[in-house]
Amino acid sequence: MRWIVLFASLAVAACATAQQAVPLPPPPATSAPAADTFRFVSDGPAGPGWSRPDEIARKYFHENLTALFERTLTLDAALPQRATLRWIFTGPRAGLTVELTSSRIRIAERYYDSMALYEGQGNFPEKTTFTDERQYTGDARTLTVIADSHLAVRVLINGQQILEAPLLFDLTRHQLMLAASRTAHQIVSGSLVKPNIKDATVTINESQVHQTMLGFGGSPSIAAYAELSDQGKRAYWQILKRYNLLLSREYPMGTELKPDLSNLEDLADATPHYYGDNFPNSELSSFDYSRHVLDLGGSVIYELWALPSWATVPNNGPHATDTWNKPIKRVANPNEYARLIVTYCKKAQAATGSAPAIVGIENEVDQPPEVFSSMALALRRELDKAGFTATKIHMADASFMFLGIDRATELRKNPEAWKTLDYSAVHEYDFQEFLANPDLYDARMNQMHEAADGKPFLATEICINDPHYQEPSYRIALAVAQLYHKNLTELDAVALMFCWLLLDVEQPSFAGSRSLLAPDRTRSWIPVPTSFQLRVMGAFSRHVVKGMQRIGVETGDPDLLATAFADAQNETLVVIIRSTPSRRLDLQGASHAWAEIEHTGLEDENSVAPFRTGNVIQPGEILVLSTIKAQ
């Protein structure tokens, strides 16, 4: 992980280079207009307010910061000796402070969202979690702080980068304070530079036609759904309809399933998915739930995880190991496995009127390649024999894309088995290796696209499960938004699915990182968003409906990510900006008149307004233009 390495390297660097001062370049000429000004007088009147009786009055900048930002201060003169200018950035959970003296620059990050952080001083809990500093020589006349899409914050003096630190949490406001002698007459003044706006052109090319979309969704925890009140269940289906999350990827009963499948809906046989201290919350089906999905025009995807013991046999083939290098002692019995799936399809058809639209071979569990091939062949044969010829099959999806590449490569060695598969599929947990630098994942995605050999691709599980990144911030969600874009444009994904649609947890970080929604026990058991992940997925899902085709679109800007979709009646454009400054968009090539525009960001939760020209997209924002009027 980039930031694990960075923490270690910074610690070493702090010791090795603590005495090496950085020579600054000459102060740059600045002609940018000022958004605001500040003036501190060290021996002037004390600031108003309670609890700081002799503090120099602070300067408060009355703006809300965008998710990504670049802000620059200019100083009218060199900072006096023994004076410290503190630039304080705050957010809902944590903040950072940049301190500038006449010879040193320092950054400190602190959390203040839990009483567990109280260390015995001050009137609120807080704990500093990161610090770094460097000495410099020269005349510091501009100070710049950049919160970028690489999950980092960078500090520049006179345009030269001096410090870089990890930044996972959101920042929303900022202020200045001066710490200086109250008995000396020192003046520190300057201005906050007004952020500029660049022009950008987005050109749609409808002659370039790519994949046809199936939709968006994820896995519901049926145990969590059962916890919802009647009001909560109604709200849940309204949310799924509003966000067009109508692909229901079942996480059905496996190890506890009886041979006749008589207990597949029995809540008493649910198993705990071990996120911390979770109660039993998974491996359960509900035909009532599936009926609701179908009534909304959605589809059910059925895939077993660990098989029941009665559907396995000892591995008498060549020695094989799983992902964790443990020997595979038992493998699937292809015929019994196929019987299980067909029995489920019959029960589903009887209860809901429809068999699953898609069946996956097996979720994450490793089988020798020849066993996966036998499972695919047996499943297709038995589905067809039972009349379920319309039910499609997707390949066994591995946890990581690099394993998915290997699986697809091995499966293609058996052309007959490969032919039975309608979709390629994989989970994308290895994206977290590149969360701070998403473009580095491109090579792996291109390899998967090649290995899929033209089969439509399903992104079957996307979420954050690395404990280093379980911060429920918009900044983390924005990194996942880039992954959605890359799936659509590099893998030609026809479906995007978050890990869980609904999940009940004990430790809250598992909710914000794993699930879009969770039951709120404090509000009559209604479903509520766990983080910014719901709105970010909604930026794609709400205006891209089943049957739309992805079409070509160009921006000429590597930090302006655009995807476009169209069918005979409608058109949708999704634009992500992952850098500063803001862009004023000139939209070209659309053949339909836009009906509405939707803003998604740190402040905007899929906020819809009538279309207008001259749209400006703010750093870190997702802008959607569509002919479809979403709910």
What are these regions (language model features)?
Residues 554-591, 621:
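Carbohydrate-binding surface patches
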Residues 197-357, 361, 370-377, 381:
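N-terminal catalytic cores of secreted or lumenal carbohydrate-active enzymes
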Residues 336-358, 365-465:
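Active-site neighborhood of glycoside hydrolase catalytic domains
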Residues 582-606:
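Beta-strand-rich binding/interaction modules
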Residues 23-196:
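Extracellular glycan-recognition regions
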Residues 608-631:
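C-terminal beta-strand-rich structural cap/linker in extracellular carbohydrate-active enzymes
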Residues 456-539, 551-556:
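Aromatic/acidic polysaccharide-binding cleft in carbohydrate-active enzymes
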